[in-house]
């Protein structure tokens, strides 16, 4: 048994790697045709008429039906020797360590059986996929970390001011709503802030002030608009009343005093020249009425005798 394993190992690591091993199986009950039968697979029960024998260097030994452990080892060795293409390549195992172990002490068939199981194609594929997936996971983690750093660095933190700092800034803003670089630097040193923070605070404060002023102007304009709307409605009502009164007066005026085409006195208009002539005539009439009346000469009445004689 040991000779068979050593022979297989020597041929495998000697460069041939033909998958050939030194083994001897004799059939006691069978003939030459039985010897040409393929070796049994792992886990398959051997025929009851056949007995497997191995060479241990000193002579032949036969495995009885009770020696199940030896028969299992022999079948495992045959499987490993004659079917090397079913084994997978274990990329996680260094060949130097395997060579050292082989030269120091030849492994048994049970160890040889466990190693191919450990390095099966499934395990090889899983190990390869794990190795390929590890860099991608590491890359994803690094990208997430860089994104977090970028987002953290790009996001601005809100400035938290104390009551004293806010009061000083408000007083300064009431005096000057804008600051030159020297005033900005001095105020930043006084408040233990950065000049950029002071500048941003003043910008926000000016924006809030402008917004409040805009709201106030909007309210004022809204009130003015409402007032003008009410005044316009009142004027419309008065105009309607005057038109109704005019129509009523024109309907009640006597038509025999005025011609059909003569408008009523309330709507009579005169040109400037006629107006001057009318005013001059009125003035002359007033002056003549104010002058003293002339005395009218009268004759004395005749005596009564003359009147009687004539009669």
Swiss-Prot record:
Residues 212-256 are annotated as: Leucine-zipper. It is found in: Nucleus. One of its GO terms (molecular function) is sequence-specific DNA binding. GO terms for cellular component: nucleus. Induction: By auxin and sucrose in primary root apical region. By wounding in leaves. Expressed in root provascular and vascular cylinder, provascular and vascular strands of leaves, provascular and vascular strands of the whole panicle, in mature embryo provascular bundles of scutellum and embryonic axis and provascular and vascular strands of young immature spikelet organs. Expressed in differentiating and differentiated xylem and phloem elements, and in outer and inner bundle sheath cells of all vascular bundles. Expressed in auricles, ligules, culm, guard cells brac hairs and pollen. SUPFAM superfamilies: Homeodomain-like. Residues 280-289 have a biased composition (Polar residues). Keywords: DNA-binding, Homeobox, Nucleus, Repressor, Transcription, Transcription regulation. Disulfide bonds: none annotated. Residues 29-69, 97-160, 279-311 are annotated as: Disordered. Residues 119-145 have a biased composition (Low complexity). Residues 294-303 have a biased composition (Pro residues). Probable transcription repressor involved leaf development. Binds to the DNA sequence 5'-CAAT[GC]ATTG-3'. May act as a regulatory switch to specify provascular cell fate. Homodimer. May form a heterodimer with HOX2, HOX3 or HOX7. This is Homeobox-leucine zipper protein HOX1.
């Amino acid at each position: 048994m040991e000779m068979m394993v050593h022979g297989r190992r020597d041929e495998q690591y000697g460069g041939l790697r033909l998958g050939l091993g030194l083994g001897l199986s004799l059939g006691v009950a069978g003939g030459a045709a039985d010897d040409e039968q393929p070796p049994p697979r792992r886990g398959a029960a051997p025929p009851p008429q056949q007995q497997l024998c191995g060479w241990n260097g000193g002579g032949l030994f036969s495995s009885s039906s009770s020696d199940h452990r030896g028969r299992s080892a022999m079948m495992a060795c045959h499987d490993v020797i004659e079917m090397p293409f079913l084994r997978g390549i274990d990329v996680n195992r260094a060949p130097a360590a395997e060579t050292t172990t082989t030269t120091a002490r030849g492994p048994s068939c049970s160890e040889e059986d466990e190693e191919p199981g450990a390095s099966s194609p499934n395990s090889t594929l899983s190990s390869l996929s794990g190795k390929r997936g590890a860099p991608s996971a590491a890359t994803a983690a690094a990208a997430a970390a860089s994104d977090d750093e970028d987002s953290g660095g790009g996001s601005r933190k809100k400035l938290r001011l104390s009551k004293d700092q806010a009061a000083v800034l408000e007083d300064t803003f009431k005096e000057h709503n804008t600051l030159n670089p020297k005033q900005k630097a001095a105020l930043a040193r006084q408040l233990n802030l950065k000049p950029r923070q002071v500048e941003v605070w003043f910008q926000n404060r000016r924006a809030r002030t402008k917004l409040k002023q805009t709201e106030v102007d909007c309210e004022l304009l809204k009130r003015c608009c409402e007032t003008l709307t009410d005044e316009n409605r009142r004027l419309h009502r008065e105009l309607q009343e005057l038109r109704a009164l005019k129509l009523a007066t024109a309907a009640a005026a006597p038509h025999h005093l005025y011609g059909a085409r003569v408008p009523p006195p309330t709507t009579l208009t005169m040109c400037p020249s006629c107006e001057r002539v009318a005013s001059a005539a009125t003035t002359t009439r007033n002056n003549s009425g104010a002058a003293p009346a002339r005395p009218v000469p009268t004759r004395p009445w005749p005596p009564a005798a003359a009147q009687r004689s004539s009669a």
